[in-house]
Amino acid sequence: MKEVKKVAFLTAGGLAPCLSSSIGFLIDEYNRVAPNVKMIGYVNGYMGLLKGDSIEVTDEVRKNALVLTRHGGSPIGNSRVKLTNVKDCVKRGLVKPGEDPLKVAADQLVNDGVDVLHTIGGDDTNTTAADLAAYLAKNDYPLIVVGLPKTIDNDVYPIKQSLGAWTAAEEGAKFFMNVVKENSANPRALTIHEVMGRNCGWLTYKTAQCYRKMLDKTRFLPGFMLTRERQDVHAVYVPESKIDFKAEAARLLPIMDKVDSVNIFVSEGAGVADIIAEMKKRGEEVPVDAFGHPRLDKVNVGQYVGKRFGELLKAEKVQVFKSGYFARAAAPNKKDLKLIEKCARCAVACALNGESGVVGPDEDQSAKIRACEFPRIKGGKPFNVRKGSFRKMLQDIGQPNPRKKRTAK
């Protein structure tokens, strides 16, 4: 096995409450068990790798690495770049016409003398890293790639719990605890809380659960119209089940009539297929990102749901609040910090042993923290809508159990 002399860190994709802390724990662990290993960070993810833009981990950074665990965001920056999307890389000026981004990135790693690449990102980030390692292996350059699973959607196979997701749910609940008070600014207020989650409803479920637990600890004064019912969650919609607008409006209308407001939690990916179909019928173009995913900020599920229910519930005011950026940029909570530290320290051990993969709780091995093999890494893991705690929450708020996927007309 080749001796590890130099490692590089790279964060990519959207933010999550684990990027800065993951790097902090990785640096600290290398400094503890392999102090002679040199370390660098590629600035702005794969963009920095393609451009040869990196920053050295100095002695000062080594000594104070754990400061990074108290912060959100990424100190070295992110970007959304797919190395196999040649057209996009050329368009953005990251490579010249005729160049293969994989080769450019591979050559940069070789020139920098990198033995281990630590990628912190979602399934796209880590499978791209696997492609890079495979490319280098064909060219007789043994690169060890050890990823950490970052996604607040918690939708990566076979990772039982992705880093930062618990924090994102907690922060989303805090966000709504404030903005829900806006329903007192207008009569018949419809408040939509749009939560991140392209294909998976886990974060929406968990955010609603955290929020309702916060309400459990909150004192109210019903005698002066300060009631829990007005601030509670009245509906939760996720991508894995359909929204029956007519049936739900019939259920929610009496609530609106009684408490003068309705509060809905909805995943940003709920009903997307139907919204896109409507956009295409109108001749509108649906923008996509570098990975071919529809730009959800352009699809705007929250606005769509708000408009449909606003009419059906005779709302005088419809407000859509998105907690995503607030939640994903937070520093990790104590529960996440423990998981991040365990995974980061395991990642260093794997790297020094020459073992590639994505380190996290392997749901196929009793949630043991280990390097999950790259061929098993895949996004789009759905939330289990049959989960007992989810169904119990729906029962508590008076919402029927979810049915098959897709939105009813």
Per-region residue spans from a language model:
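Short glycine-rich or small-residue beta-strand-to-loop segments that form or flank ligand, phosphate
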Residues: 6-16, 75-77, 115-121, 147, ...
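Accessory alpha-helical/coil subdomains and C-terminal extensions
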Residues: 108, 119-121, 127-131, 135-142, ...
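Short acidic, glycine/serine/threonine-rich loops at helix termini
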Residues: 19-22, 50-56, 87-88, 128-133, ...
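C-terminal non-catalytic interaction/assembly regions of soluble proteins
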Residues: 271-409
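Glycine-rich nucleotide/cofactor/substrate-binding loop typically near the N-terminus or early
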Residues: 30-112
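Glycine/threonine-rich beta-strand-loop-alpha-helix active-site module
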Residues: 27-32, 36-60, 130, 136-179
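Short glycine/serine/threonine-rich phosphate/pyrophosphate-binding segments
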Residues: 16-26, 49-50, 100-103, 123-131, ...
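Short, ordered loop/turn segments at secondary-structure junctions
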Residues: 12-14, 42-47, 80-81, 122-123, ...
